[in-house]
Regions:
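Conserved catalytic or regulatory cores that recognize and/or transform ribose-phosphate-containing ligands
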Residues: 1-140
Length: 140
């Protein structure tokens, strides 16, 4: 069994876990979220960009990273099941979750989450502005 050490977690952390689609179509949105986080002094964590030893499963890594984060940005565009799981896990840990979704996809989001306030956006620039404002008001 591999034990993952936590150096910082929760309120003291500068880490933000990003849960979203890894599709090529999501690259612009991924980059927009990362840009905002960096500008506000946070470290964006995307599970597909973190390297782990071979004996750590992606699920163990994912859970460890969510535990270490101060908050999460969960983008429900493309409706990936993993995003729903990751956001729910973060909520269970009492981590703030900022919900985002592209306007054209929002009507397809699951009823268990679509009643939470979402940042609805039409393009990356709009997302950057709204996300920056939300983090400044809600996290900083």
């Amino acid at each position: 069994m591999k034990i993952i050490k936590f150096t910082e977690s929760g309120n003291k952390s500068k880490r933000c876990f990003i849960a979203m689609s890894f599709s090529p179509e999501a690259t612009e949105i991924r980059d927009a979220i990362k840009e905002v986080l960096y500008k506000l002094g946070f470290i964006p964590i995307l599970i597909d960009e973190v390297h782990y030893e071979s004996d750590i499963t992606i699920n163990d890594a994912l859970i460890a990273e969510i535990k270490k984060c101060k908050f999460m940005v969960a983008d429900f565009t493309e409706h990936k099941y993993g995003v729903y799981f990751e956001a729910g896990y973060a909520l269970g840990l009492k981590r703030p979750v900022i919900y985002t979704c592209k306007k054209d996809d929002f009507s397809k989001t699951h009823f268990d989450t679509n009643h939470y306030p979402h940042i609805i956006y039409t393009n990356a620039d709009e997302l950057k502005e709204k996300l920056k404002n939300k983090i400044e008001a809600w996290i900083l």
